[in-house]
Regions:
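Short, small-residue-biased leader/transition segments that mark boundaries at the very start
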Residues: 1-5
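Long, compositionally biased, intrinsically disordered
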Residues: 9-12
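Short loop/turn motifs at secondary-structure junctions and domain boundaries
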Residues: 14-16
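Short, surface-exposed coil-to-beta transition loops
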Residues: 18-20, 95
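Short beta-strand scaffold segments in enzyme catalytic cores
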Residues: 21-25
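Conserved Nudix-box catalytic region and its N-terminal flanking loop in Nudix hydrolases
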Residues: 26-65
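Unchanged
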Residues: 50-73, 80-138
Length: 147
């Protein structure tokens, strides 16, 4: 991971710039986090946009794949960008994503993805997969009070 990250938030950008979707999620008032099979850390559901895919569809697909969400309400919050080398960006150039919020009311009984498990937490975790990015996205969502 790089040492320096620059995070910015936007109301909107050109659609073709949006490469990722991240979905801050809650269920029954608890934060929803995923634990990847190959990591000992927790992360917010999210992932890459597929060719020709609407970015909001990316958000819904990633939420379902990574959490097993069956019933949920999801809405876009804002566009974010990260500048700096990360696990998913080796160029260090500014990359853009759609930040969404979801309230999940029902989960599938098992996951069929790279995630080992889904964990519901009262507090935010200490061991983040993306510690310099995802906590700031949640902080921004909390500041906007968009529930």
């Amino acid at each position: 991971l790089g040492d320096v990250y620059k995070r910015q938030f936007y109301d909107t950008v050109n659609d073709e710039l949006l490469k990722f979707a991240v979905i801050i999620s809650q269920s029954n008032g608890k934060w929803v986090f995923c634990k990847h099979k190959e990591r000992d850390t927790y992360e917010v559901p999210g992932g890459h946009r597929e060719d020709g895919e609407d970015i909001f569809e990316t958000a819904k697909r990633e939420l379902q794949e990574e959490t097993g969400a069956i019933k949920f309400e999801i809405k876009p919050i804002c566009v974010y960008s990260v500048t700096g080398k990360t696990r998913v960006n080796d160029t260090g150039k500014e990359t853009f994503g759609l930040l969404c919020f979801a309230e999940i009311t029902e989960f599938a009984t098992e996951l069929h993805s790279e995630m080992e498990k889904v964990v519901l937490m009262n507090e935010l975790p200490e061991n983040w997969t993306y510690p310099l990015i995802q906590p700031k996205l949640i902080e921004n969502k909390e500041n906007l009070k968009l529930y």
